[in-house]
Design a protein with these regions (language model features):
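Outer-membrane beta-barrel porins/channels
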Residues: 1-222
Length: 222
């Protein structure tokens, strides 16, 4: 990440950079499968990952040794990780699928998956925390996405050693978009001796993300 500023400086530009490391959470899952005769296959998968346990780290030192091996030392960003723990939560993913094969050279497939929301209710992109991830940020907007649903349908063809797979996928999710976080100042007494609170509140805008995808895969078995 790199950014620059000319505020409070007599030069045209002063630059600084920061290297980060982001450790994603463990993902756990179970799966079940069942066949009916030699024409129908059914499958179900459940996965869970706790995104509140993500670890944002800053690179303190990095180097290559004599054998060209890369090494680095990093430290956790305490305040950013506290914000992550507050804003994000565990996500469950459910995947269901089935395949019908009336002939050895042809297959019909259907699938569905549901992903629960990653964001806690009221999650904010806090621009006031003491973290390089905030210092070097060049945007203030964020979107709290809700659950995601996907539906897929496809067909597969087998020609000798060639295999052709065609699939269509529709995905949909809704969210709340914020151009910036809301700010509330501490109470103060104005010139008329009246207690006041400055408020810069940002109301969210409902947004929707809908996607249509067509996928094609051609493979050859040696």
């Amino acid at each position: 990440t790199e950014n620059y500023t000319t505020i409070g400086s007599n030069v045209d530009k002063s630059a600084a950079s920061e290297d980060f490391r982001f450790n994603t959470p463990w993902k756990f899952g179970i799966s079940l499968g069942h066949t009916i005769g030699n024409q129908i296959a059914l499958g179900a998968v459940y996965e869970y990952a706790d995104y509140g346990s993500c670890d944002m780290r800053t690179i303190d030192d990095a180097y290559y040794d004599y054998y060209d091996g890369y090494h680095e030392n990093s430290s956790s960003e305490f305040y950013m990780n506290q914000l992550t723990k507050k804003n994000l939560k565990g996500v469950s993913t459910i995947k269901l699928g089935g395949e019908f094969r009336p002939d050895k050279s042809f297959a019909i497939r259907l699938g569905y998956n549901h992903v629960t929301p990653m964001f806690n209710k009221g999650a904010v992109r806090d621009q006031t925390i003491d973290s390089p991830g905030v210092y070097y940020a060049s945007t203030t907007d964020y979107t709290n996405w809700g659950a995601t649903d996907r539906i897929t349908a496809g067909v597969g063809f087998t020609f000798d050693k060639f295999r052709l797979d065609l699939a269509y996928q529709y995905s949909q999710r809704n969210g709340d978009f914020y151009p910036f976080m809301s700010y509330y100042s501490a109470d103060y007494i104005d010139a008329d001796n009246v207690r006041q609170t400055e408020v810069n509140e940002c109301s969210p805008v409902s947004v929707s993300d809908k996607r249509h995808q067509v996928l094609c895969t051609l493979s050859y078995s040696f």
